[in-house]
Amino acid sequence: MTIDSYFASLPDGFASIEQMRDLLPAPVQKVTFVGVAGTAGKTAVAAFLAATLHAQGIRTGLYHAGCEPLAKRIRIDGAPVDEGLLSLTAQALSAAEPLPRDAAELTAAARCFGEAGCTLAVVELPDAGLAAALPQMPVCAVTAVGPLLLYYF
């Protein structure tokens, strides 16, 4: 089974915060996360923020949700995650009770960031409720693009 087929086989739905936290090993606890949530513009905001942090010399992880292969959506210092590291992460997750797909992908990204020694990681949140599972998330950027802005301003 390939990495992508493993994640594609996972169910939709919601994971408990405790279930996700149980799958985050010690190295993940050292990473500070910045979540990006909202209706539109998440990918651009997350990529810009990660590039800015990396340009300042900070070892930075980036995860964005989407339909590309997961190995392309998890990045460390601007480069796609090492396939070997992602494979080890997928093996560890497959040994546990299955998480829903969005939660499993975010957990895999967090594990990769911890193992790669990232100081900061910018994560696009497919579900803002997943933010509570990640350790050290002092800030969450929220994007809102569209007619909603006219209502509030």
Name what the model sees in each region.
Residues K42, A46, A103-L106:
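Short alpha-helical patches at coil-to-helix transitions and adjacent helical residues
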Residues F7, Y152-F153:
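Compositionally biased, intrinsically disordered low-complexity regions enriched in proline and serine
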Residues M1-G38, V45, A51, A55-Q56, ...:
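Short functional linear segments
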